[in-house]
Amino acid sequence: MILSGKQIKDSLGKDIVIEPFNEKQINPNSYNLKLHNELLVYDEEVLDMKKPNKTKKLIIPEEGIVLEPRKLYLGRTLEYTETDKYVPMLEGRSSIGRLGVFIHVTAGFGDVGFKGYWTLEIFCVEPIRIYSGVEICQIYYHDVGGDYEKYSSGKYQNNKGIQPSLLYKDFIN
Amino acid sequence: MILSGKQIKDSLGKDIVIEPFNEKQINPNSYNLKLHNELLVYDEEVLDMKKPNKTKKLIIPEEGIVLEPRKLYLGRTLEYTETDKYVPMLEGRSSIGRLGVFIHVTAGFGDVGFKGYWTLEIFCVEPIRIYSGVEICQIYYHDVGGDYEKYSSGKYQNNKGIQPSLLYKDFIN
Amino acid sequence: MILSGKQIKDSLGKDIVIEPFNEKQINPNSYNLKLHNELLVYDEEVLDMKKPNKTKKLIIPEEGIVLEPRKLYLGRTLEYTETDKYVPMLEGRSSIGRLGVFIHVTAGFGDVGFKGYWTLEIFCVEPIRIYSGVEICQIYYHDVGGDYEKYSSGKYQNNKGIQPSLLYKDFIN
């Protein structure tokens, strides 16, 4: 079962936190989230799963920034979210997808109990000028069956902003 | 809860409309949709979220058309659909994905109440010859929790064919 | 409704088979699957939906392999799975997506009744060195509504390993 927009609103302050929240961003069965003006790009010739890959920070200026196709841009949602009792999921908006802009790289699936900003994996098919503050994606919620253990991984929980991959930690222990 | 193929069939003419409909396209828990022969491509050096980007129309001929990797092709489903009471979602088929052809750009998430053809955001990893009429994707349905307001956005509701992004309208009001 | 990690564990040997299974790979509402060391790449200038496209096999060596951006790599899960009563779905992990590595090409949607290894459609935004055995994706489960007919397609059921696209068969009958 996917929560309706009305149910998302009714759950605020109980099982769901979205801050800041704006009624205009409610959809029939989801809620739109905005793009923050910070981006991270990797600074490596070849990335490596086993290493903490170097990154550089970019700020999206008022007049926007042009994204290049063969580059991954890590962004984040303006909104901070917390979710209990439901599985939060992120997907792009069709208006964004129709411009060939991916907002995640097969990684829109969340965990019940996750707290923080959502890091976005942005990739474009054709060069495109984007702007911070745009409603770039939507969050939606599934009910979860049976009892569960909340998300508590040391990697991305309670994050304060964009986080590059911490996959290399899997190879250490 | 995802509707089974049988339930999709039982809901036809009530909460679900798929036209044309063919029993052979029913799967265990989804229904296959076909590719129309029209495509739109953008006609811009650099796309811009704040502008109505120019497009050109292509027709897929009988012998098929070769898609190029660094190009976004907007297509559409042959079928017209309407959905009430459930959240409709679109995903590719594994036979299509195994050829490296994306059918949406993180935008397979629908809205309860949506009426129209589905615009497909087609992008290929390697050059590939595709054909119109192929069963290119599948529609599936989730139940929605609680009462809801049906999709009624002025952008894509009751569309008559492929629609490029109308994101620029977000920046006007 | 999405199964919690605990429910996935409780369903093992009944409606869900995951072999091999390791408790450490359970998440709040999914289970992580590992990457086998075999890859297939297509050996064609231009792929064609109507033809059985030629492929070449690669083995990921101990020191890993560098993936190139404009290439599709078909891999597979180490684990064999069977699912009844639920719809199995595959999605990447955020640690993998944050490195720009797709693990499916809009094809993460499964069928109730599917038995076999999952073929992965791997595509990277930037060049990256990957390693076999890494926890590359996660499987999660939705309940299915009403009675259903289990997946029994001749194409990918009971597979023994990576399978390239068999789409051309759709054009034969």
Curated annotation (Swiss-Prot), chains A, B, C:
Active-site residues per Swiss-Prot or TrEMBL entry: E121
HAMAP family assigned: dCTP_deaminase
Catalysed reaction equations from the record: dCTP + 2 H2O = dUMP + NH4(+) + diphosphate
Entry annotated with the keyword Disulfide bond: no
One Gene Ontology molecular-function label: nucleotide binding
Enzyme category, top tier: hydrolase
Assembly, per entry: Homotrimer.
Gene Ontology biological process terms in this record: dUMP biosynthetic process; dUTP biosynthetic process; nucleobase-containing small molecule interconversion
Lineage start: Bacteria, Bacillati, Bacillota, Clostridia, Eubacteriales
Reported function: Bifunctional enzyme that catalyzes both the deamination of dCTP to dUTP and the hydrolysis of dUTP to dUMP without releasing the toxic dUTP intermediate.
Pathway it works in: Pyrimidine metabolism; dUMP biosynthesis; dUMP from dCTP: step 1/1
Name of protein: dCTP deaminase, dUMP-forming
Disulfide bonds: none
Residues the entry annotates as binding dCTP: R93, S94, S95, I96, G97, R98, D111, T119, L120, E121, Q138, Y151
Sorted UniProt keywords: Hydrolase, Nucleotide metabolism, Nucleotide-binding
InterPro entries named in the record: dCTP_deaminase, dUTPase-like_sf, dUTPase_trimeric
Enzyme Commission identifier(s): 3.5.4.30
Similarity field: Belongs to the dCTP deaminase family.
